[in-house]
Amino acid sequence: MLDRWGADALRDSDGTKLDAATKALDAKIYTTYFVARGHNEFAQEHMDECQQMLLMSKHNVATENTVTIDFLDGYYREQVVADYVHDPKKWWEVIDRTTGEVVPVSCWEVDQDKDLVTIKDAVPFHEYTVSFFVYAIWDPTQMYNHITNNWGDKPHDIPFDVRQANSGAFAKDYLKQWLIDNPDTDVVRFTTFFYHFTLVFNDQAKEKFVDWFGYGATVSIKALEEFEQEYGYALRPEDIVDNGYYNST
């Protein structure tokens, strides 16, 4: 087949591996390498270092002075979970979309057991949204391949954030050892690299929104803290979610 197709290289892919006999053929060997996923044993011990995203709830119309928002409604809960490690009152944002005003943190509360935000002193018939941080607990590229190819009970790859101390050190150390352990590899094919393009799924496990040039999957609380430290001003959640447009391009 190599001769008939004129191939000069062989490569694996997400979900496949080349066996030793194949790697010994007279061809260049490309090996897929995942920098920040595919290491669940490490990731499960550092779930507070999962990659993060800022998402926005659906627009919810208040019909009385109190409105409760299921902010994860419409999102795939096998992909994301709300971040309660960090204080929602500091990092989340509730907005009256009718006026564009930010709702004071004193006027809303989070039910962490039910993933709900309740707003008091709401204006009837105004629309409200919640912008909130999540942890990504399933790598979206592997999730797409997993669902499309019906991989069944194959474990879900947990993406970790190399900006974090433990994850960054693990990624460096693992790569050094991997290079030693894979002498037959001619080309390391980095896949996903550190972060994804923006890829978020809905509650039917279908693509909810995709931005091939988006940076939404690079946003984390640590990143925002470091941004403020370097530039002297803080970004708001709205700078990222952009009323649901996610500031694409």
Which positions does each model-derived feature cover?
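Glycan-processing catalytic domains of CAZymes
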Residues: M1-T249
